[in-house]
Curated annotation (Swiss-Prot):
This is Putative F-box protein At1g26510. It holds the Pfam family FBA_3. Residues 1-23 are annotated as: Disordered. It comes from Arabidopsis thaliana (Mouse-ear cress). It comes from the Eukaryota. Transmembrane segments: none annotated. InterPro entries: F-box-assoc_dom_typ3, F-box-assoc_interact_dom, F-box-like_dom_sf. Residues 24-71 form the F-box domain. PANTHER family: BNAA05G37150D PROTEIN-RELATED, F-BOX DOMAIN-CONTAINING PROTEIN.
């Protein structure tokens, strides 16, 4: 009968002890030094460190590391497209499905294909509304009871358990809390066969990484409301505009605290906005504040709110005119912002093969048009329904 050598066991224990001591030394390094070390590595090497230890992953995912690159704004573009493979076959034999493509731009004007995700989009996609939200490197895609979370850096995705209860999902939101290091998806549901002006009746939340089902949120203390805009996540809070009041005839800003799972009516809209016929429903994160761009003809008015102030006032209105570009572009929407404060504008639809976005610099009062050079081998984009969103994308989650 063989017995393990005590000498070998002692050597193994010494190796384990040495690795543990090295890990402790790394954990004790100042954050700025860790960030500088990772910045000197190639991106592929940085990605490998995500699986090395929780400490490395926390540093790489931190906002300090993400915003430490002194480069021009980097933009992530997510585009839902109907694709058809380009084989020499009759059209009836060519495959056709819905896919989600991610493109990322660098400091240059060109954009390269990044990753591709085949989503379970319905063949009746023009009749179904999908909700897309970004939070700290990940994107959630929601359609009724189906919820998907994807990593655009790797193309990987997970499908969440179906939302409980036989109800219709009115809207879904997505957020990240940096304190608890948790991602959460929240869904607002309503009774089947209800009217579009009825308030949402149940609110549920799912925490990524936890092996727990959807959890019901207690909303008995807040007024009835129905989500109307997209959601924007800032410092662990998800903000969205909702219809409130009698007959859902008013608009208010709601705030969902991710760590506490607490939802409340945060503030009402300015009196001036209540009298306008509002068409824009895209909230933005503008320099850490909630912003709402509204378009009147060729002029954009961007309202910015101070959510940290006592009165939660809408502090200022930014105005810029896109008339100089009306001849060279289609109808433009403000789709996002960069970490340097530039607004990103893009058409709602791309009916041909020309892809582009505009960057508006408020300080210089100037527009920059970026044409996106997109080439996908053996695939031709037949039609692109919309640009889903544009975001700062340095994260390697």
């Amino acid at each position: 009968m063989r017995t393990r050598s005590k000498k070998t066991k002692t050597v193994n224990n010494n190796n384990d002890l040495q690795k543990s001591e090295e890990k402790q030394k790394f954990d004790q390094l100042p954050l700025d030094l860790e960030i500088e070390m990772f910045r000197r590595l190639p991106l592929k090497s940085v990605a490998r460190f995500l699986t090395l230890s929780k400490s490395c992953a926390t540093t790489i995912r931190s906002p300090s590391f993400i915003t430490s690159f002194p480069s021009q704004p980097c933009t992530l573009i997510a585009s839902a497209a109907t694709i058809r493979t380009c084989h020499n076959l009759p059209s009836s034999f060519k495959s056709k499905d819905q896919r989600l493509y991610f493109f990322s731009s660098s400091s240059s004007s060109s954009t390269v294909f990044s990753t591709r995700l085949t989503c379970p989009l319905s063949p009746y996609d023009n009749l179904i509304e999908y909700y897309y939200h970004y939070a700290s490197g990940l994107i959630s895609i929601g359609c009724n009871r189906k919820q998907i979370v994807t990593n655009p850096s790797t193309g990987r995705f997970i499908t969440l358990p179906s939302v409980r209860r036989r109800r219709v999902v009115v809207k879904s939101f997505f957020g990240y809390d940096p304190v608890s290091d948790q991602y959460k998806v929240s869904c607002m549901t309503e009774r089947r066969h209800g009217l579009r002006q009825d308030p949402s009746s149940e609110h549920q939340v799912f925490t990524l990484g936890e092996k727990k089902p959807w959890k019901m949120i207690d909303c008995t203390s807040i007024p009835d409301h129905r989500p109307w805009s997209n959601g924007v996540c800032i410092d662990g809070f998800v903000y969205y505009v909702a219809k409130t009041g009698q007959g859902m005839s008013q608009l208010s800003l709601m705030r969902y605290a991710l760590r506490a799972d607490n939802l409340n009516l945060f503030t009402s809209l300015p009196e001036e906005l209540r009298t306008l016929k509002l068409s824009g429903d895209t909230l933005l994160n503008y320099e850490g504040n909630v912003a709402w761009p509204l378009q009147l003809h060729l002029i954009f008015n961007v309202w910015v709110m101070d959510q940290d102030g006592e009165k939660h006032e809408w502090l200022k209105k930014i105005t810029f005119n896109i008339e100089p570009w009306k001849s060279s572009s289609r109808y433009l929407d403000v789709r996002g912002t960069t970490h340097t404060g530039e607004f990103i504008l893009a058409p709602s639809h791309y009916p041909d093969d020309e892809f582009y976005v505009f960057h508006y610099n408020l300080g210089k009062n100037s527009f920059t048009k970026k044409k996106l050079q997109v080439r996908i081998y053996n695939v031709r984009i037949v039609s692109t329904s919309s640009i889903i969103g544009l975001y700062l994308s340095f994260s390697l989650l």
